[in-house]
Amino acid sequence: MKCLLYLCLWCYCVLVSSSIVLICNGGHEYYECGGACDNVCADLHIQNKTNCPIINIRCNDKCYCEDGYARDVNGKCIPIKDCPKIRSRRSIGIPVDKKCCTGPNEHYDEEKVSCPPETCISLVAKFSCIDSPPPSPGCSCNSGYLRLNLTSPCIPICDCPQMQHSPDCQ
């Protein structure tokens, strides 16, 4: 019996009935065919495992946080109640203006759209944007840049993990 070791996920596998079962460490559980979204603290106000705007075009064999847990900035599943509170400047009455867009490779946009998100996953995922909120002022990435997640800085598209083997980025 041969078993594979997935060091990049800090997981291990066992052979069960001639199929590989992934065992996840920590507060995770394994789904043989899961959705595209996981619970991530920084994104819970927009999407989660049960409210995912990404339309699956294939099954995702990966570790997901257990119900009631979400990934923190280090990728560790923590109780959702322990996630830092995400408060947008608009929600606390501070207007978003050009001075607020101080991150590298970003600019102020009067009509920023939220769907599809300007994140790396949008390069390979289909989004259902039918019920997305109307455009609103905010900070957008410059052309040729995306974010790893909704709260990270803008990076060159070729730095997105999804573009790792793209001939356009060699």
Curated annotation (Swiss-Prot):
Annotated signal peptide: 1-19
Gene3D superfamilies named in the record: Laminin (2.10.25.10)
Residues bearing attached sugar chains per UniProt: 48, 149
UniProt GO BP: anatomical structure morphogenesis; extracellular matrix organization; wound healing
GO molecular function, one term: metalloendopeptidase inhibitor activity
InterPro entries: Ser_inhib-like_sf (IPR036084), SerProtInhib-TIL_Domain (IPR051368), TIL_dom (IPR002919)
Site (Cleavage): 88-89
Domain of life of the organism encoding this protein: Eukaryota
Induction: During humoral immune response. By lipopolysaccharide (LPS). Induced by A.niger alpha-1,3-glucan.
Processing and modification events after translation: Cleaved. Five disulfide bonds are present. When artificially cleaved by thermolysin between Asn-56 and Ile-57, the two obtained chains (called heavy and light chains) remain linked.
Keywords annotated in UniProt: Disulfide bond, Glycoprotein, Metalloenzyme inhibitor, Metalloprotease inhibitor, Protease inhibitor, Signal
GO terms for cellular component: extracellular space
Main function: Inhibits thermolysin, bacillolysin and pseudolysin, B.polymyxa metalloprotease and human MMP1 and MMP3. No activity on trypsin or cysteine protease papain.
Protein name: Inducible metalloproteinase inhibitor protein
Protein's gene: IMPI
